[in-house]
């Protein structure tokens, strides 16, 4: 029964893979990807700094020292 159900699924998946990318998914713009990566890095850095400062200023860290 499993084989009977898995064969049509396999055929559909193979047809989707062999079809190729859609026209809208053509070549991605490298500069926009780099800009998004840079923006992600900046926001991650800001959030990490906020967390570190919050930990430094918290009473719990002062009590454990």
From Swiss-Prot:
GO cellular component: high-density lipoprotein particle; very-low-density lipoprotein particle
Keyword Kinase listed: no
Residues annotated as signal peptide: 1-26
Gene Ontology MF terms: fatty acid binding; phospholipase inhibitor activity
Domain of life: Eukaryota
InterPro entries membership: ApoC-1_sf (IPR043081), ApoC-I (IPR006781)
Keywords: Lipid transport, Secreted, Signal, Transport
GO biological process: lipid transport; lipoprotein metabolic process; negative regulation of cholesterol transport; negative regulation of lipid catabolic process; negative regulation of very-low-density lipoprotein particle clearance; triglyceride metabolic process; very-low-density lipoprotein particle clearance
Pfam families, per the entry: ApoC-I
Subcellular localization: Secreted
Keyword Lipid metabolism in record: no
Miscellaneous notes: Apolipoprotein C-I is present in acidic (APOC1A) and basic (APOC1B) forms in P.paniscus, P.abelii and P.troglodytes and perhaps also in baboons and macaques. The two genes for ApoC-I arose through a duplication process that occurred after the divergence of New World monkeys from the human lineage. In human, the acidic form has become a pseudogene sometime between the divergence of bonobos and chimpanzees from the human lineage and the appearance of the Denisovans. Pseudogenization resulted when the codon for the penultimate amino acid in the signal sequence was changed to a stop codon.
Family: Belongs to the apolipoprotein C1 family.
Listed name of the protein: Apolipoprotein C-I, basic form
Gene: APOC1B
